[in-house]
Curated annotation (Swiss-Prot):
<keyword id="KW-0699">rRNA-binding</keyword>
<keyword id="KW-0694">RNA-binding</keyword>
<dbReference type="InterPro" id="IPR019927">
    <property type="entry name" value="Ribosomal_uL3_bac/org-type"/>
</dbReference>
<comment type="similarity">
    <text>Belongs to the universal ribosomal protein uL3 family.</text>
</comment>
<comment type="subunit">
    <text>Part of the 50S ribosomal subunit. Forms a cluster with proteins L14 and L19.</text>
</comment>
<dbReference type="GO" id="GO:0019843">
    <property type="term" value="F:rRNA binding"/>
</dbReference>
<protein>
    <recommendedName>
        <fullName>Large ribosomal subunit protein uL3</fullName>
    </recommendedName>
</protein>
<dbReference type="GO" id="GO:0006412">
    <property type="term" value="P:translation"/>
</dbReference>
<dbReference type="InterPro" id="IPR009000">
    <property type="entry name" value="Transl_B-barrel_sf"/>
</dbReference>
<keyword id="KW-0689">Ribosomal protein</keyword>
<dbReference type="GO" id="GO:0003735">
    <property type="term" value="F:structural constituent of ribosome"/>
</dbReference>
<dbReference type="Pfam" id="PF00297">
    <property type="entry name" value="Ribosomal_L3"/>
</dbReference>
<dbReference type="GO" id="GO:0022625">
    <property type="term" value="C:cytosolic large ribosomal subunit"/>
</dbReference>
<keyword id="KW-0687">Ribonucleoprotein</keyword>
<dbReference type="InterPro" id="IPR000597">
    <property type="entry name" value="Ribosomal_uL3"/>
</dbReference>
<comment type="function">
    <text>One of the primary rRNA binding proteins, it binds directly near the 3'-end of the 23S rRNA, where it nucleates assembly of the 50S subunit.</text>
</comment>
């Protein structure tokens, strides 16, 4: 398993540990795995090499019938989250039902973590895009936090796509790179990551080698 691969995990929260120099290090506690392999996709059949892994045991009422059959075919119980991991190399060292754990990583490794950012709801242009806003007084009325002009009049006659305006903020896919593994606790499937990672507490994450 020399090829770089990742596993699914769940953010449990943040704490701090003390390094060898005695300084406190902020870390994010992540439950990484165990992730059984549900399906192996190959170039010959699907057109590309990939592993389909699962994480977090789920209830029958939360899993569709098609996915229930998919898990049953693999001889596995039901899971809440499923993820596909593309690989370039050979898949001979993997088999359906094989479990991937935090043993894939080592202390000091650099990893990248993908998750969904914390949702902020509907926000104005000042908070969402850091706009300056209008004057507080002297001729300014009811537009103190307005976005301002959003385009010309006759030409082009419409608002360009991508214009920064008020709207929903957060719950977007975010990837943070070059995060360092501070500690690994295999008996609890716990991995400690230096610094913060995307998403709220209990959200799902995908952790892969940098």
């Amino acid at each position: 398993m020399s090829e770089k691969i990742g596993i699914l995990g769940q953010k449990l929260g943040m704490t701090q540990v003390f390094g060898g120099n005695g300084f406190a290090v902020p870390v994010t506690v992540v439950q990484a795995g165990p992730c059984p392999i549900v399906q192996i996709k190959t170039v010959e059949k699907e057109g590309y090499n990939a592993l389909q892994i699962a994480f977090g045991e789920g209830k029958k009422k939360h899993v569709s019938k098609s996915m229930q059959g998919h898990f049953s075919k693999a001889g596995l119980s039901l899971y809440r989250k499923i993820q596909e991991v593309r690989l370039k190399g050979s898949l001979t060292s993997y088999e359906v039902g094989q479990v991937l754990t935090v043993g894939l990583f080592s202390v000091g490794d650099k990893v990248k973590i993908t998750g969904k950012s914390i949702g902020k709801g509907f926000q104005g242009a000042m908070r969402r895009w850091n706009f300056a806003g209008s004057k507080d007084s002297h001729g300014c009325e009811k537009v103190h936090r307005a976005a301002g002009s959003i385009g010309n009049n006759t030409f082009p006659g419409h608002v360009f796509k991508g214009k920064k305006m008020a709207g929903h903020w957060g719950t977007e896919k975010v990837t943070v790179q070059n995060l360092v593994v501070v500690d690994i606790r295999p008996e609890d499937n716990i991995i400690l990551i230096h610094g913060s990672v995307p998403g709220p507490k209990n959200s799902f994450l995908f952790i892969s080698m940098q």
